[in-house]
Amino acid sequence: MDYKQTLLMPKTAFPMRGNLPNKEPERQKKWEETNQYAKTLERTKGRPLFVLHDGPPYANGDIHIGHALNKVLKDFIVRYKSMTGYHAPYIPGWDTHGLPIETALTKKKKIKRKEMDIAAFRKLCEEYALGQINNQREQFKQLGVRGDWDNPYITLTKDYEASQIKVFGDMARKGYIYKGLKPVYWSPSSESALAEAEIEYQDKRSPSIYVAFEVKGGQALLSGGEKFIIWTTTPWTLPANLGISLHADLTYIVVQVGEEKYIIAEALFDDVSESLGWENPQVLQSFKGKEAEGIEAQHPFYDRTSLVMLGEHVTTDAGTGCVHTAPGHGEDDFYVSRSYGIDAFCPVDEKGVFTQEAPGFEGLFYDEANKIITEKLDASGALLKLEFITHSYPHDWRTKKPTIFRATSQWFASIKDFRVDILEEIKQVNWYPHWGETRLYNMVRDREDWCISRQRAWGVPIPVFYGEDGTPIITDETINHVSELFREHGSNIWFEKEAKELLPEGFTSEHSPNGNFAKETDIMDVWFDSGSSHEGVLLNRQNHQRPANVYLEGSDQYRGWFNSSLSTSVAVTGKAPYKAVISHGFVLDGNGRKMSKSLGNVIVPSKVQKQLGSDILRLWVSSVDYQADVRISDDILKQTSESYRKIRNTFRFLLANLADFNPNTDRVKEENMEEVDRYMVHRLQNVLAEAHKNYNQYEFAPVFQQIHHFCSVDLSSFYLDFAKDILYIEAKDHPRRRSIQTGYYEVLTSLVKLIAPIIPHTAEEVWEYIPEPEAESVHLTDIPEARDVAINEQTVDKWNHFMKIRDDVLKALEEARSEKVIGKSLEAKISIAAKDEGTKKVLDEMEHLHQYFIVSEAVIVDTLTDAKEGNVVNVQVEVHPGETCDRCWVSSETVGENKNHPSLCSRCADVVTKHYAD
């Protein structure tokens, strides 16, 4: 007889290799064809609502690895919530206005914007943005991200723009919107104002100069001829200098150096003296800053004076304590000058070029003027020192070019008027990680008013009209009318119609007695676009609510979307738009470096999908501490693939050993299951409990680690291993075999549901092979909660202790193998002596020890002399004296007892005789 035919070997069509790059697209197509997203919503209808609100990526270019990290993290949460008692819709969004799209058209597509009608150019921008959305949508779907991809929210749609106008109007009605002249971040490369959120800092090489301003009219304090020393890294702002700021309470000194007398802050005497190389400087006089208020000094190259003013912004951190003040080029400069009745003066145009107001420098780009201005200072004797420094300097985050401060007339949101409310709301939000609260709190506490106007074409128009006297007109009537116009026609109508045609019929204003009106030509900051999504999406879309349960974005969004959304929401509703905020770090290469084409270290999501599969990328996301910066490389993905193989092979083994198991007819009642099976089901409950806790705290790495550890240690190394001797060898319906299969079935169905949010393609594939599944898709089921198992605490403790015994035994077997005492563990007979009473009690209560240790015989003895010493037992390993059974490979002294089956042990002979007699 061929005894192989009598073994119940594992059988499954579930493939060992995932072949994910080929299979995932097919599965995604099936999900789309069966409309699984709609089925998920239908199944969970009536449950509590859970809304993760998508921060909209910018609709330009292919998605990068940071996008993949972001969208996959969101998908973990939404999928998990829909499998744990919630109704969790997911509406993806896109941010579509702004300079990058204008640039893409003018540079890449060679469109000449200034030769076109604005409305026509805007239509090209819209077409481009929608094309980019279609491209990114497919790339996100390829990651396995589930959502309402056919109905995303897009910031250029009519309904969205209409709701944004409402937000603007609500803020204006409360007095939070105003127009004012003051210095703002200005990007000459974009020819537009920028908000703080659009600034990034990069190193820049700049001239560092010390300049002398000679006193003219020192009042009673100074005799005349003394020189204030200022320090600056922006010589190009000196043509706009109108003053010198001192701190009222600082002590200033007059220092004699050769024939010259210089004025600096006393606290900076040593630093300045060293920097300027002074020899034998003598302090002649000291006075408080407030005593010098009103003194005038001669401008170093123009025939005008600069006023000495007092400002709180003056410090002794660097410089001289005498601060060059150009009210058109600095915020502190602007405010301190205004308090002295000095208006902003800005002789630089929108391109960063000097105007006629800066004689001698007209037509020069500001940065090019540094050299000429420095030479002019040197020629006049006002330049005391020139050197070059590299420092962190604000750049336009889109063009990567330096920005300047430039005083212009702009529209602002008056953050100061509701700052206290924002700060209070920040405290009500749950922050992951916790430091996010402090980070945003400090940003809001320190930020100035928000410049919301941009001098560009592609964006939502600022819905303001001007009367004949120049007064801005914003009323509920005009706002509601414009909002409805945008809802019906889109915002392009603003550029297609005259002001009169955009106003309500019969509209009149005291500011336009003749009925003539003009319209604003600036557009809104794109952060106002996305920052209004709480109104356009959370309030207005079905199955949504404001506040959302969670916002999740990169840590750069504390200054961006988290901030703008919070500002507009608190302004309009008094409340934060979110209950919780989660931030993730940036994706770096394997060495912790930023990715760049020049370094050749860029990991592209689509390439990973084609080479390894999206589930590998998703498993990597689940394995990292995403709240800090994370690393990815080919080697790291290779390690992730190994982890994936371990999990996949565990599922395959479980499926293969359930081929002849029907849960409806073969399941063993829990109280009748073998103790070891109940213990393993209990261990499963621990995994479920911990995983639920971590999922709910948005901690995914521990979930991955728990599942991987359970598969590797609890299952592969123990439960799946020892059970082969029962599953393959015993009769099909043997109680112990069915008990193990009952345990396997619960482990399999629970684990595949638990990991489904992380690797949805693989989980679905496993589900298709599970006998008698409860639903058509694993994603249309609920993850089980941890439950009580029919096993008492003492029994659990016993098995926990047994695992320590097993560790000692396995170590002894391994040593015996390396010493060539045995080959395979089934050749062994082991003797075990407990080192304490507790261990002895556990051993005495155990049955089937030889199977749990995968040896041919295990004997418990009181003492051992020649043994391997372990932590809780001593173990002696020797070759078993019996013969090896041809069927089960166990060495037994009963081999040969059955004359019909002389090569079998008594157990196998009995099984074959009873069940395979024919």
From Swiss-Prot:
It catalyses: tRNA(Ile) + L-isoleucine + ATP = L-isoleucyl-tRNA(Ile) + AMP + diphosphate. GO terms for cellular component: cytosol. It holds the Pfam family Anticodon_1. A motif ('HIGH' region) lies at residues 57-67. L-isoleucyl-5'-AMP binds at E553. Its cofactor is Zn(2+). Binds 1 zinc ion per subunit. Zn(2+) binds at C885, C888, C905, C908. InterPro entries: aa-tRNA-synth_I_CS, aa-tRNA-synth_Ia, Anticodon_Ile_BEm, Ile-tRNA-ligase, Ile-tRNA-ligase_type1, Ile-tRNA_ligase, M/V/L/I-tRNA-synth_anticd-bd, Rossmann-like_a/b/a_fold. One of its GO terms (molecular function) is ATP binding. It is found in: Cytoplasm. Its EC number is 6.1.1.5. Keywords: Aminoacyl-tRNA synthetase, ATP-binding, Cytoplasm, Ligase, Metal-binding, Nucleotide-binding, Protein biosynthesis, Zinc. Gene3D superfamilies: 1.10.730.20, HUPs, Ile-tRNA synthetase CP2 domain-like, Valyl/Leucyl/Isoleucyl-tRNA synthetase, editing domain. A motif ('KMSKS' region) lies at residues 594-598. HAMAP family: Ile_tRNA_synth_type1. IleRS has two distinct active sites: one for aminoacylation and one for editing. The misactivated valine is translocated from the active site to the editing site, which sterically excludes the correctly activated isoleucine. The single editing site contains two valyl binding pockets, one specific for each substrate (Val-AMP or Val-tRNA(Ile)). Catalyzes the attachment of isoleucine to tRNA(Ile). As IleRS can inadvertently accommodate and process structurally similar amino acids such as valine, to avoid such errors it has two additional distinct tRNA(Ile)-dependent editing activities. One activity is designated as 'pretransfer' editing and involves the hydrolysis of activated Val-AMP. The other activity is designated 'posttransfer' editing and involves deacylation of mischarged Val-tRNA(Ile). Belongs to the class-I aminoacyl-tRNA synthetase family. IleS type 1 subfamily. This is Isoleucine--tRNA ligase 1. It comes from Oceanobacillus iheyensis (strain DSM 14371 / CIP 107618 / JCM 11309 / KCTC 3954 / HTE831). The gene is ileS1.
